[in-house]
């Protein structure tokens, strides 16, 4: 039987750059009901940047009545207003949120809607068409801002908690609508329920890259670890040519509007998986784990990290190995 190595299995796609996007300060914090002190949020974000994270979602400009945890977003944005160490983004639900982001000096926003009608209604109480109309308003609001970035997260791009498997035709239709409005955006396909398999992720991420979209459109993947597939699915997306991968330190959070979809993929788990890959994440594991420990200590925080359970002495020894 001929011998093979990892490179024979995964091919040259293993050697393109990887960009880790940290979403715990937004996607994670919003899953905690009790208010987290603003000072603690800022210190955690600072710790993540110090650990080497260079892209972070630091919160959302949403109604404090809808998401009370984000009521202090103006204070957090004010603290990081002039910070050039990392790309900092915020989620916005509408043009007003985009305007607030601009007012507070942020240069990157994230807009989310679901491919699935049922999930979009459950999540934001709008039809998909209404959400696309909202995206048009957001794009209009930022149209005169130079060097302003927008990312669109397509929730339920693989599976819907209410309707089951989402057909690729629905994903393609959503992408076409998005790129018509924002040809230079980054589009993230989100495994909202965490039920996608690595094979499904790889197939779909390859398929979207074959679509006739503007060359300025780029791709990302946002997975959940609900079924234990978080790292495997992120790697499948990477092997399909996707270099931008979302994670949350300590595996904090999930989708509050997708029943059972707990657990973002833990940043530390994915960073460990990239050891010896030939693609550096630039993240210091020791520093990252300290921040993950602090996140896990937040009252009512539901975390899902594997690496945090490994004895630190054993982890340090492994990190020293070539």
Can you describe what each PLM-predicted range is?
Residues 2-322:
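Catalytic cores and adjacent flexible loops of soluble metabolic enzymes
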């Amino acid at each position: 039987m001929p011998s093979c190595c990892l490179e024979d299995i995964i091919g040259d796609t293993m050697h393109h750059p990887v960009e880790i996007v940290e979403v715990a300060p937004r996607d994670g914090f919003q899953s905690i009901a009790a208010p987290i002190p603003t000072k603690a949020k800022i210190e955690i974000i600072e710790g993540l940047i110090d650990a080497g994270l260079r892209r972070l979602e630091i919160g959302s400009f949403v109604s404090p009545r809808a998401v009370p945890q984000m009521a202090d977003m103006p204070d957090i944005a004010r603290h990081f207003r002039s910070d050039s160490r990392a790309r900092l983004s915020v989620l916005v639900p509408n043009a007003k949120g985009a305007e607030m982001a601009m007012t507070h000096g942020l240069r990157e926003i994230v807009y989310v809607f679901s491919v699935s009608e049922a999930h979009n209604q459950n999540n934001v109480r709008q039809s998909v068409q209404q959400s696309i109309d909202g995206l048009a308003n957001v794009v209009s609001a930022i149209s005169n801002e130079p060097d302003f970035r927008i990312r669109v997260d397509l929730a339920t791009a693989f599976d819907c908690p209410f309707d089951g498997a989402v057909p690729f035709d629905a994903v393609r239709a959503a992408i076409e609508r998005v790129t018509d409005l924002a040809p230079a955006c980054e589009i993230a396909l989100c495994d909202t329920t965490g039920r996608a398999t690595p094979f499904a992720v790889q197939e779909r991420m390859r398929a979207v890259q074959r679509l006739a979209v503007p060359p300025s459109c780029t791709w990302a993947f946002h997975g959940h670890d609900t079924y234990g597939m978080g790292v495997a699915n992120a790697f499948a997306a990477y092997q399909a040519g996707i270099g931008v991968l979302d994670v949350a330190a300590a595996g904090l959070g999930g989708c509050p509007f997708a029943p059972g979809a707990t657990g973002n993929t833990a940043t530390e788990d994915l960073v460990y998986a990239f050891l010896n890959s030939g693609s550096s994440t630039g993240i210091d594991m020791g520093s990252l784990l300290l921040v993950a420990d602090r996140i896990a200590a937040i009252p009512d925080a539901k975390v899902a990290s594997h690496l945090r359970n490994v004895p630190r002495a054993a982890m340090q020894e492994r990190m020293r190995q070539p």
